[in-house]
Amino acid sequence: MRTAPMLQFPLDEYEQRINNLYSVLEKGGFTAALLTNEDNLRYFCDYRSALWNNEYESPAMLVAVPGRLVLVTSTRTVQTALATCCLDEGDIFAYDGFGEAACPEALAPAIVDTLRKLGAVSGKLGTEIGPVTRMRITYNDRAAIFDALPGLESVDVSMDLLGLRQIKSPREIDVMRQNCRIAVDAFKIAADKVVLGETTEEDFYHNYAAASYDLGADDFSLQLVVEFGPDRMQPNGVAGPRVYSDPDWCIFADSGPTLKGYASDMIRMAKLAPPTAEQQRLMDIVLGCHALVVPMIKPGTTFKEVVEASDNYMREKGADGFCMTIGLLGHGFGQDVHEPPMITLSTEGCFKKGMVFTLEPTLLHPTEGQFAIENNYTVTEDGCELLTPQLQGFYIPERS
């Protein structure tokens, strides 16, 4: 392994991740694994390329066997691999036309040749075919690989890999802590720029994105959800041309930027006028839910316990009829905005040290609109740390 010029973590970070990958292969009895998704390539070797945004091309794939990991890419993009990827040059296999839209016939033979070179011609081939993943490969290419190597059997390895990625290292948590702060600070900057009768939802989005980059973020994995007014209850809707035309309207924003490939996912709310009594009552219900369940969370607390407590609280407050998060209170996140574990009544398992997750109690009131505060947390030795401490409740910009 080598320290590539653009490598984003120290080499020992990737060494540990790759060793964990080898352990998964050995424990599961896998002959090899074929990894095609951007998140996995970035996680295990830091390979990066703008071509991931092109749905018609596959810039690179990883093939792993116990004790060795190789990157398969095109001869035209070897320099990209050498600039970003931690693997030695001898572990970068380049093939003419690999993954290129103009040479679709090149991909499957390149993967077959790589597997043969690594001695992986029979047994279990780990592939990304789990319930929350999919392979970045066409059906025909996948069929061609297994036609050429009939001794291989496709078996899901994605959930094992997501299990590795659930537990963040201290370095990952440091990056996510920084990015989560950027996410909320950018909301404040965008809210401070709202002008009654002029600012649109799209303007807010643009101001938020500009502030995020100015504060140090480097990308977005999802569009920012922006909603003005009580009649715009569109969970995960996109910003539109609506103008902020009533100071009693709420400003609602959801998601956040990324930093070094790691997401943030906050919800914050603002207004240009103080909240009405009913708006404050609804916000207090949301904040009370966080106050109730967060002290419960520590290593060993089950997801079900936390969701049951939240659901019972919403019933006691008479909000269960318009609470969107009954039965589902949050989710893990990392390189993706939504990753396991899902924090639901039906999710087996418990919180573990190093998990990073959101809690987003959300009310969809029929006349008042959408109310939520989504906070980001990480599980510590004996509790959890709030990664988004700023702006709890309504933010009211000061006007001179």
Protein language model regions, located:
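Active-site neighborhoods and metal-handling regions in enzymes and metal-associated proteins
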Residues: M1-S400
